[in-house]
Amino acid sequence: MAEVSLTKKEMTTKGKSENSKKMKTDMADMVPIAAMNEDLLHNILLRLPAKSFAFASCVNRFWSSVCNRILSRPKMISAFSRNPDQLRAGEEVLDKVLSEPIRPQFVIANITCGNMEETLTLITERVGSRVPIIVSVVTGILGKEACNDKAGEVRLHSTSDDELFDVANFAILLTIGYLPGMKVDIIPVIQAKGESGAEMEDKFVMDIRNYMSMVSGHAAAPACLILFAEDTHATEPVLHKLDYAMPAETVIVGGQIGEFLHKRGNEPRNVQLQKDDIRVLAGLIFARDRHRPAQAERIQFDTAISNGMSSVDLRYKAANVNVSLGPSCPSTLLTAKRRGEAEVLDGDQILDDIDNILENYIWENDSYLGVIKRRKYSIGLEEKPKIMSSLVFHQVNGSDDQDLLVDGAGIKTGDQFQVYLPDLKVAEAALNDVSAQLRNLKSKPNKPEVVGGFAFVGSCRGDSFFGCPNADSSPFLENFPELPFGGIFCDGEIGRSLILEEGEEKKEVSIQRFLHVYSSVYLIVSYTS
């Protein structure tokens, strides 16, 4: 905090009259400081970086009230750096996002490589130990560069035909937010040794409900959850249980496959895992503060999704299903029947079906099974199970005259599926739809101001997919060119959507689509004054 010094005339003091005269002169000199015009003070404080602003808010009640008015509106700022030095890159993005008044409520750091613990420590030193922080390793980042505010992308690129990836330089994206009226913290999912998947899933849901009860009141739902998950077979069931448990108004976005560290708001540093514990995911939870309802209701979270896949118009039912437990991730061997037919097809026959329709197109692209999983869900033992249908993607890894081989597990005999392929035209049309959604947001009667944006983009998209840079950033750039947005390239994009499918009895069936591939999931944070 800058010190304010007053110029005093050099004078010789003699007697009480001289002292009294000097006191009156000093008090007269101090009046302009104490009674500084509020608008002038507002303009001065508005230009301070975050640290100086924090000191200024402690000067006196008047300054504090002006600071509070400056921060009466929410802020969400992202910036990235390509600096190959991890420490300097971290300092660059921290300097950028803290270059204006803000009281950090949460920080998200995404790095392409390097040491997550170092980044977590650096951020904690700059923003304080009471701020929840998530650090994750991702396959790429996008947003605006800290040094020039220009939009750009940093991605992993294939270095050989065996699809090994390499990043020559470190890059970091930092996102910091202040949302008055909201409480923000991190709810982690750690699977303890011997803990069943069902116990872990239920505990996560109950931890969320308990936090909401404490912050927002009984039966309240989170406004938003941002999820970062590890590459573990335990992740998918947790996410489906969460999708089932959270009401439709809760916005949920994230990345399913990656690495992360986290620090909760009440923890001074990252908590080390116990031996044999497994880090599954961390959820950044946004809850409306029941003590500040007016402010909380002015903040809205919205999502938009750009899908990049199209289905082949052939429907199958899984016949024989066998799971193979690999060293890191399980895989599934299956045969299938065409819907309405009795003949069991092996893996080669299934792909020959697709090959005949698409004229060898399948072998030029990634192919996926889009499996409709109709399952019963409940929370704990007291709740009656309910059925939810979800569309889940499994990448095709090969076939022979016996089986079709796909990634992952959880497919059951009788599950219906179609083959899905990346489709550039679908992706481009979907991006235009997302951009139109954002335009419509601007034209709402209450005229919300978009204050933040974040994108979770499939790692196979980007310039190599679209043939041009910044395509996945275009909805933000076209509609909000000044917005300091950010985003990551990841695997397993998380975003809630509902689709209607025609069932076997010609009835429409609602199907949840929560986990995506070849898509972009956009989070938009807006504020209504």
From Swiss-Prot:
LRR repeats lie at residues 265-288, 418-441. The lineage of its organism: Eukaryota, Viridiplantae, Streptophyta, Embryophyta, Tracheophyta. Residues 1-22 are annotated as: Disordered. Pfam families: F-box. It comes from the Eukaryota. It comes from Arabidopsis thaliana (Mouse-ear cress). Residues 31-78 form the F-box domain. This is F-box/LRR-repeat protein At5g63520. InterPro entries: F-box-like_dom_sf, F-box_dom, FIST_C. Keywords: Leucine-rich repeat, Repeat.
